[in-house]
């Protein structure tokens, strides 16, 4: 999650119209969306973004019973399902990142994720440290059983139809859907001549242009497990996406042992390494979504190799001793 976004404007450097702004929140796909636009007070463009959020939630969510993704899951092992160009494009993007990550990012992880049930358990515990009873942890037999059905290569595409060849597989686009939707919102706003703004989809931050005074936006990266909400560092960006995956976002503890939601597709268990979070800076929020999870699973050394092989992408790693590691000095990363 991104801790803070600084978008204040200097009166002496901005034109009167640039002082105008409009900001609005909504709640979609179980997260808070906040959109702030500069140079306008008209809410209609934000409302247009919220309409898009609703459209894509109904299309892509596996918790919406008649979504295209849910229909693919219901037909697993039986038949092809006709889907929209948007759903098809996102599934292809998921397959692409499956190849890029050698399966560490896998959009057929649905049933394994369901077994761990991080979101519901973490949200419903009254414990300050998310301490829960050991009975909530799935058995190794269950984990290995679900893991055997995690394989993005079981996704078959024929024209605009999609099928899961494994009847026990379950598609889950949650790892890239928010980024995809953020990119769609940005394209829509730019088509309406919006030149300055911030789209925040539950921590997926995508900026449009620069601040209205011509300076960069400052995006704070949350200090893991810090309840104050203070950032551990901040990065200055313009017209970029900033996406973070961290173990502190959804987790629970059993007898003090932490179980987090970023699952290792080679073991079925939460990834074990020395990372607390990975932040990706990129042009595309969808790419940032997939890469943040992928890089976390790979660990710092292999993740740096991957990032260095890509154009226009950088990463910021926060380790379990709160050290900060970056892939380059291209961005101004300030620490507290």
Regions found by a protein language model. Give the residues of each.
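Mature catalytic core of soluble alpha/beta enzymes
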Residues: 1-336
């Amino acid at each position: 999650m991104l801790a803070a976004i600084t978008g204040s404007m200097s009166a002496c450097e901005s034109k009167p119209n640039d002082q105008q702004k409009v900001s609005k929140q909504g709640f979609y796909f179980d997260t808070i969306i906040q959109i702030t636009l500069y140079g306008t007070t008209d809410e209609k463009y934000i409302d247009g973004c919220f309409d898009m959020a609703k459209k894509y939630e109904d299309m892509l969510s596996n918790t919406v019973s008649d979504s295209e993704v849910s229909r693919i899951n219901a037909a697993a092992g039986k038949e092809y399902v006709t889907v929209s160009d948007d759903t098809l494009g996102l599934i292809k993007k998921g397959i692409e990142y499956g190849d890029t990550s050698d399966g560490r990012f896998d959009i057929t992880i649905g049933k394994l994720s369901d077994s761990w049930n991080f979101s519901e358990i973490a949200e419903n515990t009254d414990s300050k440290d998310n301490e829960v009873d050991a009975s909530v942890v799935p058995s190794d037999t269950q984990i290995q059983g679900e893991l055997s059905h995690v394989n993005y290569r079981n996704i078959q595409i024929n024209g605009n139809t999609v099928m899961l060849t494994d009847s026990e597989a379950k598609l889950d686009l949650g790892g890239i859907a928010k980024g995809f939707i953020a990119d769609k919102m940005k394209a829509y706003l730019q088509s309406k001549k919006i030149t300055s703004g911030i789209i925040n989809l539950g921590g997926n931050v995508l900026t449009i242009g620069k601040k209205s005074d011509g300076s960069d936006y400052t995006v704070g990266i949350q200090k893991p497990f810090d309840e104050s909400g203070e950032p551990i560092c901040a990065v200055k960006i313009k017209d970029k996406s900033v996406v973070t995956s961290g173990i502190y976002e959804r987790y629970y503890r059993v007898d003090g042992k932490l179980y987090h939601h970023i699952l290792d597709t080679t073991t079925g268990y939460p990834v074990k390494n020395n990372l607390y979070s990975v932040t990706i800076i990129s042009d595309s929020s969808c790419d940032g979504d997939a890469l943040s999870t992928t890089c976390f699973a790979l660990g710092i050394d292999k993740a740096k190799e991957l990032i260095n092989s890509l154009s226009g992408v950088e990463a910021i790693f926060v380790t379990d001793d709160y050290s900060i590691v970056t892939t380059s000095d291209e961005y101004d990363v300030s620490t507290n």
